[in-house]
A protein has these predicted regions:
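Extracellular beta-sheet repeat scaffolds used for adhesion and glycan interaction
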Residues: 4-5, 9-58, 96-103, 108-162, ...
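Flexible, low-complexity linkers/stalks enriched in Thr/Pro that connect modular domains
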Residues: 2, 72-95, 176-199
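Short, exposed coil/turn segments at beta-strand boundaries within extracellular/luminal domains
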Residues: 65-71, 169-175
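Conserved structural position at the C-terminal beta-strand
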Residues: 61-63, 165-167
């Protein structure tokens, strides 16, 4: 456990005799504390203790003459040190935004990758969250997997990724965080009055021409959003070129 202050509970085989004393030790019997458990309390024990380091809890009964019954013992570990592993090179497999590292994507199903500063301990657990720490999922990354993390996640809306290590005692290391945007809604802007500057065919609007270099003109149904990109293809969509048309261009 990572918590020193505890409530110790136990069930006695019988109620204490009138002059019996219940004693508890948190340091393997080196010192004992008399508990105020009395005959009228029945067989259920509940008492406050404070653990220290790695040791054993002992519980015993001492009678009025000083005779001591057999102690029940339970080893414990108090660990209050959080894992110190950190994370670098956090990435998702399908970052479809304007930059390959902006964590803006249209794809919910992702592979999350990261590099750990050290291999995790045998009892440590790697955890991930896709909703800013609202819920955590234990990953099957093990000590033998080294420092390279690769795990499947499913993004939802706009939130923050968290990655952290939790040890066997429940201590939690510092989380690495990365905001992301999942946007699955396609732009609805349409185009009218599409034209080229030099249409040399039999009609000025038949798009037959003997001129390769053209100025393409069109009217958008609305101004593009601040982060939208207008793209143009001249080969039936096989390849696309980003245009410098901006929000203020109307």
């Amino acid at each position: 456990t990572k918590t020193a202050a505890q409530t110790l509970t136990a069930t006695l085989s019988a109620a204490l005799a009138a002059d019996d004393i219940l004693q508890v030790s948190v340091n393997a019997g080196s010192s004992w504390a008399d508990d105020d458990h009395a005959p009228g309390d029945g067989v259920s024990l509940s008492t406050a203790i404070t653990l220290s380091g790695t040791s054993s809890i002992h519980i015993r009964i001492k009678d009025d003459a000083g005779n001591i019954g057999t102690a029940t013992t339970q080893a414990y570990i108090l660990d209050t040190t959080a894992p110190t592993i950190t994370f670098t090179s956090v990435d998702i497999s399908a970052d479809t935004g304007s930059s390959a590292t902006d964590f803006i994507t249209k794809t919910a199903a992702q592979t999350l990758t990261a590099t750990l500063s050290a291999a995790i301990a045998s009892d440590d657990i790697l955890q991930t969250s896709i909703n800013n720490g609202g819920a955590w999922v234990d990953d099957d990354h093990a000590a033998g997997d080294g420092t390279a993390l690769s795990t499947s996640i499913t993004l939802s809306g706009s939130s923050t990724l968290h990655i952290r290590i939790k040890d066997d005692a429940g201590n939690i290391g510092t989380a690495e965080t990365q905001a992301y945007i999942l946007d699955t809604t396609a732009p609805t802007i349409t185009y009218a009055s599409v034209d080229i500057s030099t249409d040399t065919g039999t009609s000025a609007t038949d798009f037959n021409t003997n001129t390769a270099a053209q100025t393409l003109t069109a009217t958008l149904s609305a101004a593009i959003a601040a982060d939208d990109i207008l793209q143009v293809s001249v080969n039936d969509g096989s390849s696309w070129t980003d245009d410098d048309h901006a929000t203020g261009d109307g």
